[in-house]
Amino acid sequence: MPPSAPDDDRDAPAPPHPQIGAYLDALKFERKLSQHTLASYARELAVLQQLGARFAAGIDLMRLQPHHIRRMMAQLHGGGLSGRSIARALSAWRGWYQWLALRDAAVTANPVDGIRAPKSPKRLPKALSVEQAVALMEQLPGDDPEAVRDRAVNELFYSCGLRLSELVGLDLRHAQAGDYASASWLDLEAREVTVLGKGNKRRTVPVGSKAAEALAAWLAVRPQLAQPDAAPEDAHALFLSARGKRLAQRQIQTRMKRNAIAAGVPADVHPHVLRHSFATHMLQSSGDLRAVQELLGHASIASTQVYTSLDFQHLAKIYDQAHPRAKKK
């Protein structure tokens, strides 16, 4: 685990505060925490003690106030520590003060309560360029049933922005027989898929013409992989493995990565990259955030807004390349 403070905050560490040692013993013998977790707590509390000596000199740690904690947090943040790491430190400190309050009447308030770590910047999802996406769709080698299936899988991911779990759950068509009922299905004639997404929310997504062509080609060879005595879960599955079983998530991930390399796509390609690429390219083309939200099945528009950052990056790049006053001399 990386340290929770810059190196200069860890030089010449002072002996542990007696109550910190007692707290670590309680974590070890009463809560039976692992050595790894104990070491993490010890590091975070050592940082508290070192920063306390700097920003609250002459004040016992047990008497620190919220403004002391905020100054310490600002020091950690200014030293380049991530919001997640600061949150971990605050959690350890908060736990120590809670423990103290149960044992020392003089500790009447927890100075860490109500203090939150700064938010770390959201990691933007990776997306293929349009050229890379086209290469992945059009340059997959082979014409055996598995290769034809893989092209249909890729086209459907990119056309509909489906989650991996949604795609593997697709049936050939809506089916209900005995105890079996389709949760998600393809309607190729209507050129749409109906999927059961997160939170058991069902949505219908249109299928593009290229994906429809790839699906028709796959359906023509699918009988070569189908098994006559298959269980309903496999018999109704849209995508089958070489053994006639419903195609598994791991199989899709492995083959997609291998096919991407064969197509000369340098990015680390996996199903979610195609979902991100779908969203990014749709937003760049339409600018309709609400429509992209509906297509992706996001419950909140906030989940979709991350793609506006990607769109701005795209626009900024085009500006830098095209605007005569933006070009570097």
UniProtKB/Swiss-Prot annotation:
Record GO biological process: cell division; chromosome segregation; DNA transposition
Domain of life: Bacteria
Domain Tyr recombinase intervals: 123-320
InterPro entries the record matches: CB (IPR044068), DNA_brk_join_enz (IPR011010), Integrase-like_cat_sf (IPR013762), Integrase_catalytic (IPR002104), Integrase_recombinase_N (IPR010998), Integrase_SAM-like_N (IPR004107), Recomb_XerC (IPR011931), Tyrosine_recombinase_XerC/XerD (IPR023009)
Residues annotated as domain Core-binding (CB): 14-101
Entry annotated with the keyword Membrane: no
CDD domains assigned to the protein according to its UniProt record, in alphabetical order: INT_XerDC_C
Keywords recorded for this protein, A-Z: Cell cycle, Cell division, Chromosome partition, Cytoplasm, DNA integration, DNA recombination, DNA-binding
Record-annotated active site: 163, 198, 272, 275, 298, 307 (o-(3'-phospho-dna)-tyrosine intermediate)
GO molecular-function term, one example from the UniProt record: tyrosine-based site-specific recombinase activity
Any Pfam family matching the protein: Phage_integrase
Cell compartments where the protein resides: Cytoplasm
An annotated GO cellular component: cytoplasm
Keyword Metal-binding attached: no
Quaternary structure annotation from Swiss-Prot or TrEMBL: Forms a cyclic heterotetrameric complex composed of two molecules of XerC and two molecules of XerD.
Family to which the UniProt record says this protein belongs: Belongs to the 'phage' integrase family. XerC subfamily.
Purpose: Site-specific tyrosine recombinase, which acts by catalyzing the cutting and rejoining of the recombining DNA molecules. The XerC-XerD complex is essential to convert dimers of the bacterial chromosome into monomers to permit their segregation at cell division. It also contributes to the segregational stability of plasmids.
Name of the protein in question: Tyrosine recombinase XerC 1
Organism of provenance: Ralstonia nicotianae (strain ATCC BAA-1114 / GMI1000) (Ralstonia solanacearum)
